[in-house]
From Swiss-Prot:
Biological role stated in the UniProt entry: Catalyzes the hydrolysis of the adenine ring of phosphoribosyl-AMP.
Organism: Saccharopolyspora erythraea (strain ATCC 11635 / DSM 40517 / JCM 4748 / NBRC 13426 / NCIMB 8594 / NRRL 2338)
Cellular compartments annotated: Cytoplasm
Binding site for Zn(2+): C83, C99, C106
One cellular component (GO) term of this entry: cytoplasm
Source lineage: Bacteria, Bacillati, Actinomycetota, Actinomycetes, Pseudonocardiales
Protein name from the UniProt record: Phosphoribosyl-AMP cyclohydrolase
Family: Belongs to the PRA-CH family.
Cofactor(s) in the UniProt record: Mg(2+); Zn(2+)
Annotated residues for binding of Mg(2+): D82, D84, D86
E.C. numbers: 3.5.4.19
Domain of life: Bacteria
GO biological process: L-histidine biosynthetic process
GO molecular function annotation: magnesium ion binding; phosphoribosyl-AMP cyclohydrolase activity; zinc ion binding
């Protein structure tokens, strides 16, 4: 599938063998890490043009817009590329839970190490 992603941006991406880059969503204002998902060039293009968090589902092999069915939307304020080009950071306003479980973040349920 051809993507409308700016070729200058596409050239900077370092993709997995499946053509994906990691995408981390962070709450604007607090810096809270909400979730991690995958994007290909088209998902990134859609996110940049619509300001809606748009991702690629590896299991379903299709695009999904965060909150399209749940109402738990993400309005994207910034998109940044990390220094290696293999991860994008989306700074968002998250409506309700970001995790598919309903939790605020995908990192709420399983703490492996915490300060005592």
């Amino acid at each position: 599938m051809s993507s409308g992603l700016d070729p200058a941006i596409a050239a900077r991406l370092k993709r997995t063998p499946d053509g994906l880059v990691a995408a981390v969503a962070q709450q604007r204002g607090t810096g809270e890490v909400l979730m991690m998902a995958w994007m290909d060039d088209e998902a990134l293009h859609r996110t940049l043009t619509t300001r809606k968090g748009t991702y690629y589902s590896r299991s379903r092999q299709q695009y999904w817009v965060k909150g399209e069915t749940s109402g738990h939307t993400q309005h994207v304020h910034e998109v940044r590329l990390d220094c290696d080009g293999d991860t994008v950071l989306l700074v968002v306003d998250q409506v309700d839970g970001a995790c598919h479980t309903g939790d605020r973040t995908c990192f709420d349920a399983d703490v492996l190490l915490a300060e005592s």
